[in-house]
């Protein structure tokens, strides 16, 4: 990893990335795509060491409290977060200023900060967003080798449910010929319903492949599933959207089950829920901080 002094932190949508790059090693990672123009190796994580100070300045400049969310490009709970505590320090400042917090992660390291999420949620609002991809433990360790499995993330969701902290799941990607089975999707959905998630984000039964991420994904397929990359090339050529042959049936299953259990399943509805601040905490007085 290497350290930088960032010039700014929050996007116009109040999103932030504390780290740039990732060491989780997910074989399908879209953030490896060349369009993102990384100037350093993806695993050489860039650390925005002044992020907590930038966040505090940005919050002090706002007249109203809002939800502060981490981006999906780089998980805020990198292994180095154990020592650096950037995410934790940002959460402490979010709590102090009465803002809301939403974090998207695949790591059970988020449990370290559950007390902070609890306090923020009691004062304003916090939402944990967690990615679930595959119910099979062995396959999960192949596809996402350096982070906890989806089954372990389910346990995290249950713990947040116990604290009555809202959760949203990203059910993506579903990999053609690997995880795009009815059995896998149904198991993941059952976990979501059992954990009381508010919404499930699913853009389709498939994944996206671009220059940079496609080559990395195919090399992983060649290592672990010989011949499968050839099947992808024959089926999809260089397509960006790579949908499962069972896409339509799986999406019908997804929407039907979510409707039955009263769970948000339109991505825009999920995003609106995440971004909405409770009316009683939307107005911020900095003199209370």
What residues fall within each predicted segment?
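Auxiliary Fe-S-binding modules of radical SAM enzymes
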Residues: 1-5, 183-289
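Conserved strand-turn element in the central/C-terminal portion of the radical SAM core barrel
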Residues: 135-137, 144-146, 159-181, 204-207
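Short, electropositive alpha-helical surface patch
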Residues: 84-87, 118-130, 179-196, 221-224
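Acidic-and-aromatic substrate-binding clefts and catalytic sites of carbohydrate-active enzymes
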Residues: 47, 109-111, 176-179, 208
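Surface-exposed amphipathic alpha-helices with a cationic face
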Residues: 118-121, 157-162, 255, 259
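Short beta-strand segments at enzyme active-site cores
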Residues: 68-69, 104, 167-171, 200-204
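Conserved Radical SAM active-site core
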Residues: 1-129, 133-141, 150-154
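A structural motif
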Residues: 98-99, 165, 197
């Amino acid at each position: 990893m290497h350290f930088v002094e960032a010039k700014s932190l929050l996007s116009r949508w109040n999103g932030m990335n504390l780290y740039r790059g990732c060491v989780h090693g997910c074989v399908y990672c879209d953030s490896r795509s060349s369009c993102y123009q990384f100037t350093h190796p993806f695993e050489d994580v860039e650390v925005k060491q002044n992020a907590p100070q930038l966040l505090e300045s940005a919050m002090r400049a706002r007249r109203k409290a809002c939800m502060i969310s981490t981006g999906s490009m780089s998980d805020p709970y990198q292994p180095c977060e154990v020592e650096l505590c950037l995410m934790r320090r940002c959460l402490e400042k979010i709590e102090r200023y009465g803002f809301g917090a939403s974090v998207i992660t695949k790591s059970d390291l988020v449990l370290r900060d559950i007390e902070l999420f609890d306090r923020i949620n009691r004062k304003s609002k916090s939402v944990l967003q967690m990615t679930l991809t595959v119910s099979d433990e062995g396959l999960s360790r192949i596809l996402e080798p350096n982070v906890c499995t989806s089954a372990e993330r389910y346990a995290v969701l249950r713990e947040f449910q116990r604290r009555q902290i809202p959760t949203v799941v990203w059910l993506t990607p579903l990999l053609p010929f690997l995880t795009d089975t009815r059995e896998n999707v149904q198991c993941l959905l059952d976990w979501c319903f059992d954990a009381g998630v508010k919404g499930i984000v699913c853009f389709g039964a498939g994944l996206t492949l671009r220059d940079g991420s496609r080559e990395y994904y195919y090399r992983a397929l060649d290592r672990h599933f010989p011949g499968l990359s050839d099947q992808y090339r024959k089926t999809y050529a260089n397509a960006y959207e790579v949908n499962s042959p069972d896409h339509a049936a799986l999406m019908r299953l997804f929407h039907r089950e979510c409707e039955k259990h009263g769970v948000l399943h339109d991505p825009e509805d999920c995003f609106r829920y995440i971004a909405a601040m409770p009316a009683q905490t939307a107005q911020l007085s900095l003199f209370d901080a």
